[in-house]
Amino acid sequence: MSEKGRLFTSESVTEGHPDKICDAISDSVLDALLAQDPRSRVAVETLVTTGQVHVVGEVTTTAKEAFADITNTVRERILDIGYDSSDKGFDGASCGVNIGIGAQSPDIAQGVDTAHETRVEGAADPLDAQGAGDQGLMFGYAINDTPERMPLPIALAHRLSRRLTEVRKNGVLPYLRPDGKTQVTIEFEDDVPVRLDTVVISTQHAADIDLENTLTPDIREKVLNTVLNDLAHDTLDTSSTRLLVNPTGKFVVGGPMGDAGLTGRKIIVDTYGGWARHGGGAFSGKDPSKVDRSAAYAMRWVAKNIVAAGLAERVEVQVAYAIGKAAPVGLFIETFGTATVDPVKIEKIVPEVFDLRPGAIIRDLDLLRPIYAQTAAYGHFGRTDVELPWEQLNKVDDLKRAI
């Protein structure tokens, strides 16, 4: 049955949003530790509020210099985001920074360092030695909506957020401040995006800026129109798009002064904008022994290669783990009726082409590197501005041969 006039919405936030400040701090600390000790075990959570940053969690590492320098890492990242003055509501140079970090639980470390397969079953394969750092389920998704194989609503929302930051940092709109959000509502017919219905852009700004005469026309011209011109989507009608800029009428107080922020509170923004399911685990501040992060990246890698290989127009992949075990306990693949081959065959060949044990994921995606701070804002998937290993299409030929 034809389905017409359905509206689907996704949102993004800028790097100056309080929750994203926390993600950025947590991932900057992670990167600093991995740069000196690639085997660091890291689980760092951050809270920001007016004039204060609190960094807590568990870390086991030999990176003594990076560990001792966490306070400076925090300050540098806040300043890089753009909070460098009390006039903006937050200043990385003068805010209070409190560190409360302990060591990783030895009970967890035991299961990661010596997996059930090695400890109980006597497995000899080195990749069977590393167990999952926790139980859990992770999803990956890909679709042919965009060249980056992401759902169009979240892809467009991220482009708008990145552009909002770009015009602030390069001086095109110097009166903007770091905090901001975007939201995109798109009309779909039979799962095809046909019309951009509404765009909401809320951005922090200097106190003396007029909403109607300055901010709204500037955002339309320098942000929305620029992004839409670059998008050039084949089926999307943008001729009657409604733009709402700062619908409250004013957005001067922002950042940690406006709202407290926490690591891991933007997991839908980080992934597929609500278009695909989510296992519930956040990414930022976690080293790749945590399958919340590494397995979610692997599932995106699997899904994107399936779609790129022409085996389905869109696909969602789920994997599940037990803490302390290397082999997944479950794998589920949904093609939503778009598969070009028997879906059972796809589910059969995925474990043959992709080794989904945590140690193998870390090896194949080269995850023991300081690459995570760049993922803290604007999404972890489908990025067009940075190269990420889980976005590579290096398994397409293997999938075609296996099928």
From Swiss-Prot:
It comes from the Bacteria. K(+) binds at residue 45. GO terms for molecular function: ATP binding; magnesium ion binding; methionine adenosyltransferase activity. ATP binds at residues 17, 179-181, 250-251, 259, 265-266, 282, 286. Keywords: ATP-binding, Cytoplasm, Magnesium, Metal-binding, Nucleotide-binding, One-carbon metabolism, Potassium, Transferase. Pfam families: S-AdoMet_synt_C, S-AdoMet_synt_M, S-AdoMet_synt_N. It is an enzyme of class 2 (transferase). InterPro entries: ADOMET_SYNTHASE_CS, S-AdoMet_synt_C, S-AdoMet_synt_central, S-AdoMet_synt_N, S-AdoMet_synthetase, S-AdoMet_synthetase_sfam. The keyword Nucleotide-binding applies. Pathway: Amino-acid biosynthesis; S-adenosyl-L-methionine biosynthesis; S-adenosyl-L-methionine from L-methionine: step 1/1. L-methionine binds at residues 58, 104, 259, 290. Residues 104-114 are annotated as: Flexible loop. Belongs to the AdoMet synthase family. Catalyzes the formation of S-adenosylmethionine (AdoMet) from methionine and ATP. The overall synthetic reaction is composed of two sequential steps, AdoMet formation and the subsequent tripolyphosphate hydrolysis which occurs prior to release of AdoMet from the enzyme. This is S-adenosylmethionine synthase. The gene is metK.
